[in-house]
């Protein structure tokens, strides 16, 4: 990653705070937006919000690929890294709070706790898949020292991110298409 922006070198540790920054910044906006849409009777259903979130994750990966392709060398500009964090956080805000709320609303009262546990197990499975993607795009050697990767490796990384992005988009579109059926199964709970 080319971490320089406007002549300033962005500390690598700063990337760890981007997700939290975007969540704190955007969560109130999303909460207000969902309420405003609900007042106008145009709030997306829970399954459609999930679909939108998954599509934002896919778009995030594809935007990163675009950024990688647009950079002349092997390094990707910091702007593109910030964009993937932003887009993935938007996706997360369409999924996580909505999902937790849905679990409590849709689960029978006596097993809400167990269903919340299942929600977090699904999140753990997602983190496992994220680890597989990270392994497929790792740029460290066995000793752990950074290894400057080649253009061929960059191309392989772009292939992985393109595939993940396209799969996420496909799943999001599929979920959006089936969301009316899923909404009917929710028996009016949104």
Q: Could you tell me what each predicted segment is?
A:
Residues 1-2:
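Extended, regular secondary-structure scaffolds
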Residues 5, 9-104, 108-151, 155-179:
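Membrane-embedded alpha-helical bundles of multi-pass transporters/translocases
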């Amino acid at each position: 990653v080319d971490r320089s922006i406007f002549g300033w070198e962005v500390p690598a540790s700063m990337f760890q705070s981007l997700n939290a920054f975007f969540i704190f910044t955007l969560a109130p906006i999303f909460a207000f937006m969902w309420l405003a849409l609900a007042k106008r009777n145009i709030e997306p259903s829970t399954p459609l919000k999930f679909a939108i979130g998954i599509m934002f994750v896919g778009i995030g990966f594809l935007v990163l690929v675009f950024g990688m392709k647009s950079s002349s060398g092997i390094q990707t500009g910091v702007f593109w890294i910030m964009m993937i964090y932003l887009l993935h956080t938007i996706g997360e805000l369409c999924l996580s709070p909505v999902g937790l709320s849905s679990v409590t609303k849709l689960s029978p009262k006596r097993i809400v706790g167990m269903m919340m546990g299942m929600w977090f197990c699904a999140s753990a499975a997602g983190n496992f898949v994220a680890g597989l993607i990270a392994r497929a795009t790792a740029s460290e050697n066995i000793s752990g020292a950074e290894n400057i990767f080649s253009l061929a490796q960059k191309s392989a990384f772009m292939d992985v991110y393109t595939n993940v992005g396209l799969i996420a988009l496909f799943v999001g579109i599929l979920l959006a298409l089936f969301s009316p059926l899923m909404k009917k199964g929710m028996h009016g709970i949104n």
